Structures are given as C-alpha cells and as structure tokens.
Amino acid sequence: PDKLNFVLYARGQVLALDPGITRYGVPLHSGWYKTTLAHNTLVVDEANQKPAEGKCLAFGDEGGVEFVVAEAGDIYDGVRFVRSIALLDENVVVVIDQVRCGGERLLDVALHLRGQWVNLPDGSRWTPPNKDGYRYLREATVRRLEREAVIQVRPKEGWQIATALLTDAPADLITALGIGNHAEDLVPMLMVRRRASALTLVWGIGLDGQPIALSWRPVRAEPPDAMVAAVEVRLPNGKVCTFVANPDRAMAQVTLPDGTVWQTKAIFGVRR
C-alpha cells in the first residue's frame, strides 16, 4: 500500500526512508510497517491504499533538471494522485503532489526524514486516531499551515536539511515521531492534512540546510478543469526556476516573474 512512495539518499545516508518490514506475527508488522502512513505518500480517510498499478507518465532532463512524473492508479475509489519529482542539483529536490477526488475526503501526505527536529515551530498537542499506522505516532503536534513553512531536521551533527512546504490552500501541518528499523528507532514525520476534494502540495528539500523559497505562479489551462500547477523555486544563490506539473497535457499558460507568458503542453515543463 505504498504507491508513489520515494526514498531519498544523500551523503551516504538514507534520509527519506522506506520502513521495510519486521518479523511476521509482531504487531508492528501490520500495524506500522505494512501501512500506507509509514511511507512517504498519500493516505486518504486514514485508510491504507488499495493494491493498484501505477504508471510513469514522463521522465527526462530539461534545462539541467532531472525529473520524473508518475500516477498512482486506483489506490482509492474516486481519487487521482500524481507526483512529480525534480532534482535541480546535488542539494535541491522538489516534489509536487497533485490530488483530485470525486468529493470531499480527508487527505494526509506524509514525509519521514531521519534525524532530529531543529527549532520545530510551536504547535498544539494532536491525538492520533486509534488506527493502524496512526496509533504508533509519538509526540504529535499540529499547527496551521496557511500557505508555506520551513521545517528543519538534523540527520547528524554538523548537517541540517531544510524542507520548505507550499500548499494551494490552508491545511494542518502535523509533526510526530514515527518508527524506523525497530520500535525505539524514532524518525521525524511531517504530515500535511486537509479535508477537501483537491490538494496541491510542494516539498522543497534543501540538503545543505539552506531553505528554498517556493511560490505559485499564475497559470491558465485549456481545458480549465485540467490538473495543472505552476511553481517558482528560488534557490539560496538567487537563481530562479519555474516548473509546470501538467499530467493532462493541457495547454498551460504561465505568467513568469518578468511578465512574459510561457505556453507549454509538456507533462513537466522547466524554465530557468
């Protein structure tokens, strides 16, 4: 139940991890390791994904940016989930998640990052539901994510990573400690939660600890109901890159920072 889960490896260490498995018969086997929440992906209505056949929509290299776009398939009834991942350089990874539902659903997108929290923003205590995956979360807190935030984790002494988040509408940002290789191997988890029929979420992971500035760019699409998102990524060195995630291959018109209009039908477009 882990369609579109991803693993991030850098500097000799797994950062965004896959939980793996434990011994059969141990409650953690089905209660945590085999749950969707234990992976870096989408959970709907606090239930595990159904078995499904996902597919790769596109991959390649454009403007020096390596990217891949994949669709999860029929993981939940009436839900479409597309994830685009772009590698800008050895220190910057951008993930764009696009979710569409036939009606209002409870949407959770989780990211598990090894390390320790650094200056975690204040939040209120959050009591996880007594359901597989969720019941094993510890020290859970919640705060409102109006549009954007930056969360930092220290994988080891002398190394921090910064994760910037950008949502298309307010959501809850839940932080907690999940499980790694065993019950006492605690791993920080970020989870963006919204009850809605749609969600577009961007993760910008700075492996050198420098926050990445994320913002939306105005975009028009034909047809108007196509799944399209345009995001501006501003790197710590001042360089700017604009991405379009366009899995429907709609005619997308993006207004760039200089006022010019960029037209593209690419599944994933890049402007630097």
Residue ranges and their predicted role:
Residues 1-33:
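Internal mixed beta-strand/loop scaffold within catalytic domains of large alpha/beta enzymes
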Residues 22-272:
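CBM-like, beta-strand-rich accessory domains located in the C-terminal region of large
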